From Swiss-Prot:
Taxonomic source organism: Streptococcus equi subsp. zooepidemicus (strain MGCS10565)
Catalysed conversion reaction: an N-acyl-L-alpha-aminoacyl-tRNA + H2O = an N-acyl-L-amino acid + a tRNA + H(+)
Protein name as it appears in the record: Peptidyl-tRNA hydrolase
Lineage: Bacteria, Bacillati, Bacillota, Bacilli, Lactobacillales
Record site feature (Stabilizes the basic form of H active site to accept a proton), residues: D93
Active site: H20
CDD domains linked: PTH (cd00462)
Assigned EC number: 3.1.1.29
Residues reported to bind tRNA: Y15, F66, N68, N114
Keyword RNA-binding: yes
Length: 189
């Protein structure tokens, strides 16, 4: 079986460490811990790394299409590697959750997230696994765009690093157990 784990974010140094890029941060941490590296694949508009874990090929992906077009890269890679949507996991930010809270889900709507909207539109289903990382709501008077494209303050970055450690553990547990249900029971709460 082959699986694909996608972290959502925006490419380029301008967006590094922004709230909208916690999906990229999570996948970066996973590949670092596994001692693998990304290769830019211009045909698929993505950075792709891979490893064998428990006799399964796992692709780690960071689309380079910008958030709102993430589905282009995801669909192209799923098709090329013949990966089922049931073997897709997407990690992304959620502004309706408190900073640093994580939640795993099996399926669901985009919830207003443009990267998830793009993936659903391109792959034709909402039925794929997700890990949401809370980035909190904008403060009074701040636009959503300025909030998600803003960087974490020092205290929130500490909280996010703890959350990224938890996401790392959750993904590794998921890859060992091969069960989103067990992973949800273990890490949602």
């Amino acid at each position: 079986m082959v699986k694909m784990i996608v972290g959502l974010g925006n490419p380029g140094s301008k967006y590094q460490q922004t709230k909208h890029n916690v999906g990229f941060m999570a996948v970066d941490r996973l590949v670092k811990d596994l001692d693998i590296s990304f290769t830019e694949d211009k045909a698929f508009k993505a950075l792709v790394g891979s490893a064998f874990i428990n006799q399964e090929k796992i692709y780690f992906v960071k689309p380079t299409t910008f958030m709102n077009n993430s589905g282009l890269a995801v669909r192209a890679l799923l098709t090329y590697y013949n990966i089922s949507t049931k073997d897709l996991m997407v990690i992304y930010d959620d502004l309706d959750m408190a900073v640093g809270k994580i939640r795993l889900r099996q399926k669901g709507s985009a919830g207003g997230h443009n990267g998830i909207k793009s993936i659903i539109a391109h792959i034709g289903t909402q039925e794929f696994d997700r890990v949401k990382i809370g980035i909190g709501r904008p403060s009074h008077g701040m636009s959503v765009i300025n909030h998600v494209l803003g960087k974490f303050d020092t205290d929130d970055m500490i909280t996010i690093n703890i959350a990224l450690d938890k996401v790392d553990k959750a993904i590794n547990y998921y890859l060992q157990e091969k069960s989103i249900e067990k992973t949800m029971q273990q890490f949602n709460g």
